[in-house]
Amino acid sequence: MDITPFLDKKSKTPLYEQLYTFFKQEISHARITKGTRLPSKRRLSSLLDVSTATIERAYEQLTAEGYVKSKPKIGWFAAEVEPGFPTAPDHFQQSVQPGLHQKNAPAIDFHQGSVDPTLFPFNAWRKSIVKSLDRYSGSFHTSGDPQGEYELRHMIARFVRLSRGVNCEPGQIIIGAGTTVLLQNLCLSLKPGTKIGFEEPGFHRSRRMFEANHMDVTPICSDAEGVLPDELYRQNPYLMYTTPSHQFPIGTIMTITRRQELLAWAAETNSFIIEDDYDGEFRYSGHPIPSLQGLDPNGRVIYLGTFSKSLLPSLRLSFMIVPPELMEPIQNNVQLMKQTVSAHSQLALADFIETGEWQKHINRMRSLYRKKHAVLLEAIRSELGNTVEILGKNSGLHILLRLLFPASEEEAIQAAADHGVTLYPVSPSYIEQTPFTSVLIGYGGLSEEDIRLGIQKLKTAWAPLISSY
């Protein structure tokens, strides 16, 4: 599976030393297990946007100290570290409404929640299903662990640590049939009227879940760097919901400075942050920024993740990582609600991850979605030119298209529908008035050919709107 260290390029500590320290701690604490293959110099250099010399220097030091073994012409592998081996101290441990469209289903649907159905490795998934049936058949007569099957929670704890820098134990993880189910569980542990800060704009389904549970939802404004800390101190919510890795719907990536400011606010005010990392696997430019949870030394972040984008939306499997302070009340609700995902699906997914099939699938998806992403941007620039502005183009499976001609959201979506293209509105994501007209364009479920054709159709559909102003 992918291993993504975080390097602070503003630090006085040399980059090779930061990289060396990261791998040393991960191997020492068995979070990277014996025999795990480390990323190649070229891959890690590209991922972190540093020179291969930096990677090589770190790997050579790790090899010299016995943390890594080098196999010529093959790569570097984690070595076994003897108990008592000196180590550094560990870190703290403890769908959008459719737009207006015509009655007949349109040929091209730019839904932001769709994935490419041709990419899913059904044969590998079938093997994991059969294996889980054979291995755990004796346990399927019960409803399973209310918190989720331990085997899956163990694998999730491992991969989020390596890929997103998340610090957690399997006991902090709760499995649920979608993010909204997990938020419902969270709401049951809160008093009605609890003040929830919600990024403005934000994912309206999550907001409506809070509202349905009688929470006091308060919009918190953002800028290009993310949620505004001054607004948080002024509004003083108990919980703050945010999507820092790919802000929904605008698509900005919260800066490391702003992440640190949010964590400082939470620590100072004894508040909590809900980090919804809904498609953190897909990033197309820039060096990786670790999750808020991974940067947090104080246990103030509730982390939400999902397999809807990385596997299949129909699997309906998400997870919530809860800080120790909140575990008891949330666990009580888990016992009340029971588990909403079948034990069979959970155990099959655990095997799918353990055998490396999930990481192979992610790698393939990243490669193909990167190509689709490039095709989409090129088609927009070629066909729509300076009539639109592309927002949120560095990660995720959707972009925001800001209209630079004065048509309304409704007019733009209806014109597209009249030409066989479905677009999605942004206005439901705002609590207050939208500052500009824009539409959501998802591309994960479309072929490159359909992406090009869809944008060509948009050019034709919007031509009368553009020329009339």
From Swiss-Prot:
Q: Which residues form the HTH gntR-type domain?
A: 13-81
Entry GO MF terms: DNA binding; DNA-binding transcription factor activity; pyridoxal phosphate binding; transaminase activity
Task: Tell me its family.
Answer: In the C-terminal section; belongs to the class-I pyridoxal-phosphate-dependent aminotransferase family.
Q: Which UniProt keywords apply?
A: Aminotransferase, DNA-binding, Pyridoxal phosphate, Transcription, Transcription regulation, Transferase
Q: Do you know which Pfam families this protein is assigned to?
A: Aminotran_1_2 (PF00155), GntR (PF00392)
Q: Which positions bear N6-(pyridoxal phosphate)lysine?
A: K309
Q: Which SMART domains match?
A: HTH_GNTR (SM00345)
Name the cofactor(s) required for activity, per the record.
pyridoxal 5'-phosphate
Tell me the organism.
Answer: Bacillus subtilis (strain 168)
- Annotated DNA-binding ranges come to 41-60
Which InterPro entries does UniProt cross-reference here? Aminotransferase_I/II_large (IPR004839), HTH_trans_reg/aminotransferase (IPR051446), PyrdxlP-dep_Trfase (IPR015424), PyrdxlP-dep_Trfase_major (IPR015421), Tscrpt_reg_HTH_GntR (IPR000524), WH-like_DNA-bd_sf (IPR036388), WH_DNA-bd_sf (IPR036390)
| CDD domains xref list | AAT_like, WHTH_GntR
State whether keyword Signal applies: no
Q: Does this UniProt record's set of keywords contain DNA-binding? A: yes
Which is a GO BP term held by this UniProt record? Answer: biosynthetic process
The name this protein carries in UniProt is Uncharacterized HTH-type transcriptional regulator YhdI
Cysteine-cysteine disulfides: none
